[in-house]
Regions:
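Nucleic-acid endonuclease domains
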Residues: 1-53, 57-156
Length: 156
């Protein structure tokens, strides 16, 4: 098997998260019209669900701050969709209460923090313990294992 680059792993992880969310929605709400964006660089959404813009982020939590995080250039997209889902991939080294959960976030309500990584990178964090971050689905062991194949977590 060919070794994937960091970018390829991130892409595969994102695709796995989108499939998990699609399957979850189909199970929990049969009959939804789900249309995936054809353009992988779509700056507005990952998919439309019954005409609503949906973004999916697939990542391990920043365990020491109990938050999900992304670069500041993603904030506009994460705030402008109708629904944001975060697929929480277990951290390679540290257990966390969010491991294996899919969270539904209310874009206009979730609070954020800013921080700088030990590598000097500015990041936006979404604290997990707030009313606008709602656990909606516990992934199966198979789904978690698929995500873990592509996990690329830096020490956080």
């Amino acid at each position: 098997m060919t070794m994937l680059t960091r970018e390829e792993k991130m892409n595969e992880l994102g695709l796995a998260g989108e499939k998990i969310v699609t399957n979850m929605l189909n199970r929990l709400q049969p009959g939804l019209m789900i249309e995936h964006s054809i353009n992988k660089y779509d700056s507005e959404k990952d998919m439309l669900v019954d005409g609503k813009k949906v973004e999916v982020k697939t990542e391990s939590p920043y365990v020491f701050k109990n938050c999900f995080s992304f670069r500041p250039n993603q904030l506009r997209k994460c705030r402008s969709v109708d629904v944001l889902y975060i697929v929480s991939v277990p951290h390679i080294k540290f257990k966390h209460f969010s491991d294996g959960w899919v969270y539904r976030l209310i874009p206009e309500e979730y609070k954020t923090i800013e921080y700088v990584t030990k590598f000097g990178v500015r990041m936006i964090g979404i604290p997990i313990k707030q009313d606008a971050v709602i656990p909606v689905y516990k992934m199966s062991e198979e789904e978690i294992a698929e995500c873990m194949k592509y996990s690329n977590t830096e020490y956080k």
